[in-house]
Amino acid sequence: MTSSPTVNLLDLDAAGLVAYCDSLGEKPFRAKQLQRWIHQYNAADFDGMTDLAKSLREKLKGRASITMPPVVSDHISSDGTRKWLVDVGNGNAVETVYIPEETRGTLCVSSQAGCAVNCRFCSTGKQGFSRNLGTGEIIGQLRMAEFALRASRGTAGGRATGGDGKGERVVTNVVMMGMGEPLLNYDAVVPAMRLMLDDNAYGLSRRRVTLSTSGVVPMMDRLGADLPVALAVSLHAPNDALRDELVPLNKKYPLRELMAACQRYLKVAPRDFITFEYCMLDGVNDSEAHARELLAVTRDVPCKFNLIPFNPFPESGLLRSKSEQIKRFAQVLMDAGVVTTVRKTRGDDIDAACGQLAGAVKDRTRLAERTGKGKVIEVRAV
């Protein structure tokens, strides 16, 4: 007779924990206790969960675990941006990036090892697609970052609830903008986001969790029905011909379908606008004519634009738009009354800037050889 495999409790959202506790003959309130210990107190084992009955702790020891993927490296940029490289097995690694600002701290979370969308300007796509991350590997990035950041500030004790003192939350916003297309890993991403929003876990509001998609139209509709959070759309081109080239997914879901999906999503969204992300590529999509075309294609969608200076990498064959051209492009949009921001490049000295999350593609295929599997490398400032 073989024993059942242990259940990683990080893979379970609130409903999953209730069902698991029920399978052990336990009441639903035990699930809330477990969830708080795991996500608010950073418990690594069951012995310290002192408000659980000893009999339940003994059951859990033999049947469950709280398993985090190991951190391979931890780097801090000169601008305070912090990047972790996380080993997700079989030579694959994903990256998690924390961006500190004066009034908030934003965590950029990965959803896949690699990416199948293969946008021309994104280094992650050049490494190819390996696999979807599990719910525990996704929410584990937030858990790891929150408590690592609190430890570095000397506030490791207490609950991460956003209150005063030692329980003050460091990560105030999460953006699903790391490696991968979140809507192509829907069944793992949504439970992870439910935990982000759960008051017994991280307690973020729907306005503070943003999912970025390249435009998987059917799953945008499903997300709107299941868990509408703030939405960003990787647009990057004002017409189908150019977007087909830059974002191959456009061939399946062209701009007219994408704009209609955005309109439907806004009926249930926590914000009253869609954020359109637009990577500024020199001589490709950055003319004033492109800007006017962009206004036309998005005219029926309440929106704001986030212009992203391209972060060059060798395989792309692309260049960043010149600063003056970005300003001219932005001015066309602003003159039309559309809120437009230019993303400040953060963490590019540690390859943590937008579009750089794969690092050197060849390095990802030799993760174990480079670092030793599971080894944690000391933080270094750069």
From Swiss-Prot:
UniProt entry keywords in alphabetical sequence: 4Fe-4S, Cytoplasm, Disulfide bond, Iron, Iron-sulfur, Metal-binding, Methyltransferase, rRNA processing, S-adenosyl-L-methionine, Transferase, tRNA processing
**MF (Gene Ontology):** 4 iron, 4 sulfur cluster binding; metal ion binding; rRNA (adenine(2503)-C2-)-methyltransferase activity; rRNA binding; tRNA (adenine(37)-C2)-methyltransferase activity; tRNA binding
> One of this protein's GO BP terms?
tRNA methylation
Q: Where does S-adenosyl-L-methionine bind?
A: G180, E181, S212, S234, L235, H236, N311
Disulfide bridge map: C108-C354
Question: Matching Pfam families, A to Z?
Answer: Radical_SAM (PF04055), RlmN_N (PF21016)
Report whether tRNA processing shows up as a keyword of the record. yes
Gene Ontology, cellular component aspect: cytoplasm
SUPFAM superfamilies documented for this protein: Radical SAM enzymes
Q: Which top-level enzyme class is recorded in the Swiss-Prot or TrEMBL entry?
A: transferase
Q: Where in the cell is it found?
A: Cytoplasm
In this chain, [4Fe-4S] cluster is annotated as bound at: C115, C119, C122
What reaction(s) does this enzyme catalyze?
A: adenosine(2503) in 23S rRNA + 2 reduced [2Fe-2S]-[ferredoxin] + 2 S-adenosyl-L-methionine = 2-methyladenosine(2503) in 23S rRNA + 5'-deoxyadenosine + L-methionine + 2 oxidized [2Fe-2S]-[ferredoxin] + S-adenosyl-L-homocysteine; adenosine(37) in tRNA + 2 reduced [2Fe-2S]-[ferredoxin] + 2 S-adenosyl-L-methionine = 2-methyladenosine(37) in tRNA + 5'-deoxyadenosine + L-methionine + 2 oxidized [2Fe-2S]-[ferredoxin] + S-adenosyl-L-homocysteine
Instruction: Give the cofactor note text.
Output: Binds 1 [4Fe-4S] cluster. The cluster is coordinated with 3 cysteines and an exchangeable S-adenosyl-L-methionine.
Top-level division of the source organism's lineage: Bacteria
The record, for NCBIfam families, names: rRNA_mod_RlmN
Q: What does this protein do?
A: Specifically methylates position 2 of adenine 2503 in 23S rRNA and position 2 of adenine 37 in tRNAs. m2A2503 modification seems to play a crucial role in the proofreading step occurring at the peptidyl transferase center and thus would serve to optimize ribosomal fidelity.
The entry sums up its family as follows:
Belongs to the radical SAM superfamily. RlmN family.
Xref: HAMAP family: RNA_methyltr_RlmN
What's the further remark here?
Answer: Reaction proceeds by a ping-pong mechanism involving intermediate methylation of a conserved cysteine residue.
Name of the protein this chain belongs to: Dual-specificity RNA methyltransferase RlmN
Organism equals: Paraburkholderia phymatum (strain DSM 17167 / CIP 108236 / LMG 21445 / STM815) (Burkholderia phymatum)
